[in-house]
């Protein structure tokens, strides 16, 4: 049976992640409070951000920017700024 969490991003009970996908304290926080559905949505936005801003994941500054955008999106509900992208209305 899969575990459920109260997803802070979607504000509902949903299936949790199978294991901690991100290292450290932020990873633990994501594992405990973010659903599989919300993580999948974030991964799509993350890909758009990386491509739009031509980020290099070997660059420390790019990784720090992406981590800040991830925390802002998952826990504060802030949409990342992706040029030309209009989020679907709820």
From Swiss-Prot:
Protein origin, superkingdom: Bacteria
GO biological process: cellular response to oxidative stress
Keywords, in A-Z order: Iron
GO cellular component labels: cytosol
Protein name from the UniProt record: Probable Fe(2+)-trafficking protein
UniProt record similarity statement: Belongs to the Fe(2+)-trafficking protein family.
Purpose: Could be a mediator in iron transactions between iron acquisition and iron-requiring processes, such as synthesis and/or repair of Fe-S clusters in biosynthetic enzymes.
